[in-house]
Each structure stands twice: as structure tokens, then as C-alpha cells.
Amino acid sequence: MPNSKLIIADTEILRGTRVTINLELPKLYNTPTNLPIRVIRGKKDGPIVFVSAAIHGDELNGIEIIRRLRKLSILNKLKGTLILVPIVNVYGIMNLSRYLPDRRDLNRSFPGSIQGSLASRVAKVFFDEIVSWKYFIFTKKIHLI
């Protein structure tokens, strides 16, 4: 993806920057909720790597792995881009539940639908804004082992 813009959720990520994006998710009743996205873009173009965790709200270990990954000093020399989503299932994390409040498994709801259940709507936003992005050379979602 040389010499091209990197735009996620209408936010342009410039070379050599670290950006936090709060992607708006479907509301739960009248409560606004955001999906935290951390983007670390090196000063030079290179591969794009995507890592996500907590697609199930009871899988907390990946959140800590991503937190530690973000602090690695080697990222100051990054050539390329690292896109991190430490908590995909924000609703499940709030309740320490594998599922969303509609009792659906987010991991089984992709690619989602904007008219569907809460899980389907969350999947649609996440899929359209992040997962369907075609320039990834590597993606990893962290689950319990």
C-alpha cells in the first residue's frame, strides 16, 4: 500500500503517528458505545498487521497481550502499520459474558447486517470498518487457549 492514505472510520492516520479511534457501535437502548481501535503507523510504508481480542466478553487475556504489545519500544522503529482492537465485544466485557446482551455469539455473526440483531449490527460495523480491509498481510484474533 505504498504512498496511499490510511483511513479508518473517517480518520486519516498519518505516517509516524499513534492514533486512538473510537468507532461508534450500535446503541444498547439509549447508551452510546464505542469500539476502541489503536493504530500505530510507522514513518515508512510496509506491511499492515491487524490484531484483535475479546471477541468473546469472557476472554480477557488478549486484552492484556495487546496492552503489552502497544508498549514495546521496538514499535518506535516500525515500518508499516499495526492495527489493534483490544476489545471487540465491548458489551460482553461490560458483563463478563461470552455473548452480547441479545445472547448471540459475535464470532458467529459475521459479516453482519445493519438491520439485524445487536450482534449482527456490531459485526457489520466491525467487519465493514476493519476486517474487510484488503491490505492486511496478517491478521490474528486472540482467544483463550
Give short role names for the model-derived ranges.
Residues M1-I145:
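Structured catalytic-domain cores with a bias toward divalent-metal coordination
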